[in-house]
Amino acid sequence: MREIVHVQGGQCGNQIGAKFWEVISDEHGIDPTGTYCGDSDLQLERINVFYNEATGGRFVPRAILMDLEPGTMDSVRAGPFGQLFRPDNFVFGQTGAGNNWAKGHYTEGAELIDSVLDVVRKEAEGCDCLQGFQITHSLGGGTGSGMGTLLISKVREEYPDRIMETFSVFPSPKVSDTVVEPYNATLSVHQLVENADEVQVIDNEALYDICFRTLKLTTPTYGDLNHLVSAAMSGVTCCLRFPGQLNSDLRKLAVNLVPFPRLHFFLIGFAPLTSRGSQQYRALSVPELTQQMFDAKNMMCASDPRHGRYLTASAMFRGRMSTKEVDEQMLNVQNKNSSYFVEWIPNNMKSSVCDIPPKGLKMSVTFVGNSTAIQEMFKRVSDQFTAMFRRKAFLHWYTGEGMDEMEFTEAESNMNDLVSEYQQYQDATAEEEGEFDEEEGEMGAEEGA
């Protein structure tokens, strides 16, 4: 019931995804061979959200792994939980996308996409009542960004009424893996704005900061970063997988967090932050969790929520706690920091409580916020994009794959529109209602024309 089909694409997506399955399997008591060895019935009660039960009582993830080169797949297969996945669900090419969005979206990726869609259909048909899809990918490379967005648009066509949730790793401000990241990211955002329902924005620099500052790790690896991401991913879906006093699911999340259809890019945070080795020895209280969760240092993307205002936010608590206390703390945060919440959406915090905490913690909270501060991130990518595009640098790699410069211009203006939409709602007050309606009317007329 309420199944989620998970797709991971490209190197980044596959590495985050592999980590995610380690975390989820641990929570449900599934060992690397797919056998259940847990100690509580609750682990099995709704295990079919993420797993199929195969013959012999083995549990197989509803996961599809795709990439345009075999390298990452091989390392996932050789990894600790590599034997867990269904072998048919590894779909890969041989050529690689070479960090080129056009290769992932139009040429190499387009050749492979049909075999991916076949596997997606097969997984979707095995579901009782499909809730939606979750996709892990990065926006800086070629496969995760180009082929990832191609898959999203194809799945969108075929399953228009299912929720499409992505965990997208954006290029970081200071750490860059690829020179053409701004191009790839802008072209991807152009697609995500139209075809995704909720995008959880992650970036490596913020994750590094968390590792250095909060976890005091001297040399964080990608494994540590991905561990943080998967903690948040597991928190977003915990209400589907375990019983709770106040449930939420992907659709409720979307309904509560997306006030305007294009503004569905979320900041995510997690508390309490612990490094992989040292589990915390003291249990945090609900007020401490709430305080840590709203802390800018806890956000997994390099946008400071204090530079904008929250349109909406959602907190998913896990563990044994009183819902009354949760509600009080949420109100408390809103009252004390009312300037950081838009006043024209009253009660814009949603909370849910799930009784089962993650492994090794007494209680935890996952935070998902829709803040106008995220425009900083888009602005930054957009500036880098414009700097290169003005000189048409690196463009031949994209036009050589059959892309048109027009598409770049469109993606650029779509990104800039997104930034100004966020800005418009950040500046809006409750009094200006009338002016808004007129503007909306004019905009509507233009769109109609």
Curated annotation (Swiss-Prot):
Pfam families documented for this protein: Tubulin, Tubulin_C
Subunit structure as annotated in this protein's UniProt entry: Dimer of alpha and beta chains. A typical microtubule is a hollow water-filled tube with an outer diameter of 25 nm and an inner diameter of 15 nM. Alpha-beta heterodimers associate head-to-tail to form protofilaments running lengthwise along the microtubule wall with the beta-tubulin subunit facing the microtubule plus end conferring a structural polarity. Microtubules usually have 13 protofilaments but different protofilament numbers can be found in some organisms and specialized cells.
Biological role: Tubulin is the major constituent of microtubules, a cylinder consisting of laterally associated linear protofilaments composed of alpha- and beta-tubulin heterodimers. Microtubules grow by the addition of GTP-tubulin dimers to the microtubule end, where a stabilizing cap forms. Below the cap, tubulin dimers are in GDP-bound state, owing to GTPase activity of alpha-tubulin.
The family this protein is said to belong to: Belongs to the tubulin family.
Cited PANTHER family: TUBULIN (PTHR11588)
MF terms in GO: GTP binding; GTPase activity; metal ion binding; structural constituent of cytoskeleton
Protein location: Cytoplasm, Cytoskeleton
One GO cellular component term noted in the UniProt record for this chain: cytoplasm
Keyword GTP-binding (UniProt): yes
Keyword GTP-binding tagged: yes
Compositionally biased region (Acidic residues): 429-449
Requisite cofactors: Mg(2+)
Segments of this protein annotated with the region Disordered: 426-449
SUPFAM superfamilies given in the database record: Tubulin C-terminal domain-like, Tubulin nucleotide-binding domain-like
Full protein name: Tubulin beta chain
One of the GO BP terms on file: microtubule-based process
Organism: Toxoplasma gondii
Keywords assigned by UniProt, alphabetized: Cytoplasm, Cytoskeleton, GTP-binding, Magnesium, Metal-binding, Microtubule, Nucleotide-binding
InterPro entries documented for this protein: Beta-tubulin_BS (IPR013838), Beta_tubulin (IPR002453), Tub_FtsZ_C (IPR008280), Tubulin (IPR000217), Tubulin/FtsZ-like_C (IPR037103), Tubulin/FtsZ_2-layer-sand-dom (IPR018316), Tubulin/FtsZ_GTPase_sf (IPR036525), Tubulin_C (IPR023123)
Ligand binding (GTP): 11, 69, 138, 142-144, 204, 226
Protein residues bound to Mg(2+): 69
